Amino acid sequence: MANPIVGRVWKFGDDINTDAIIPGKYLRTRDMQIFGTHAMEGIDPEFTKKAKPGDIIVAGTNFGCGSSREQAPLALKHSGIACIVAKSFARIFFRNAINIGLPLMEADVECQEGDEIKVDLFKGEVLVPEKGIFKGNKLPDFLLDILNDGGLVAHRKKVKGEHK
């Protein structure tokens, strides 16, 4: 995992649910590219045509609410989103994102869509040029380890290999 993560901002509001992140009609596939090309389609059907790899989502409260579908963070990851910063996350979305290696941070950040920001997960900070540094909730070391290893499965394989 790169740190800090630098990218262009896409802004979303409160209560962005998993049905908006990846509509249910795409859930029968296992093709990650299909998930990636339909990310955020429930809010902005053109999102994946505009978003670029390395971009960052900044959102309000309760991001990822709704169903517990793991496909929601997978869709964002495979669309090229590098990180999500939100005031708060639905807990199951938060853990699903960590499990698949999608970095996120809880922070209340003042920025505009299109701004380039820098997210430092190790410090728990978001730098918005000309607006300053916004403190967020630093992830515990064990979650940072999972993200650094690329997700929970890769992390468990690494840990298991270290204990042989």
UniProtKB/Swiss-Prot annotation:
Short name of one Pfam family: Aconitase_C
Transmembrane segments annotated in the record for this chain: none
Pathway this chain belongs to: Organic acid metabolism; 2-oxosuberate biosynthesis
Disulfide bonds: none
GO molecular function terms noted in the UniProt entry: homoaconitate hydratase activity
InterPro entries reported for this sequence: Aconitase/3IPM_dehydase_swvl, AconitaseA/IPMdHydase_ssu_swvl, IPMI_Swivel, LeuD, LeuD_type2/HacB/DmdB
Catalytic activity as recorded in UniProt: (2R)-homocitrate = (2R,3S)-homoisocitrate; (2R)-homocitrate = cis-homoaconitate + H2O; (2R,3S)-homoisocitrate = cis-homoaconitate + H2O; cis-(homo)2aconitate + H2O = (2R,3S)-iso(homo)2citrate
Coiled coil: none
Gene Ontology biological process: coenzyme B biosynthetic process
Sequence motif: YLRT, positions: 26-29
Cited SUPFAM superfamilies: LeuD/IlvD-like (SSF52016)
Keyword terms: Lyase
Annotated site, Critical for substrate specificity, chain positions: 28
NCBIfam families: LEUD_arch
Similarity remark: Belongs to the LeuD family. LeuD type 2 subfamily.
Quaternary data: Heterotetramer of 2 HacA and 2 HacB proteins. Cannot form a complex with LeuC.
HAMAP family xref list: LeuD_type2
Function: Component of a hydro-lyase with broad substrate specificity for cis-unsaturated tricarboxylic acids. Catalyzes both the reversible dehydration of (R)-homocitrate ((R)-2-hydroxybutane-1,2,4-tricarboxylate) to produce cis-homoaconitate ((Z)-but-1-ene-1,2,4-tricarboxylate), and its hydration to homoisocitrate ((1R,2S)-1-hydroxybutane-1,2,4-tricarboxylate). Is also able to hydrate the analogous longer chain substrates cis-homo(2)-aconitate, cis-homo(3)-aconitate. These reactions are part of the biosynthesis pathway of coenzyme B.
Name this polypeptide is given: Methanogen homoaconitase small subunit 2
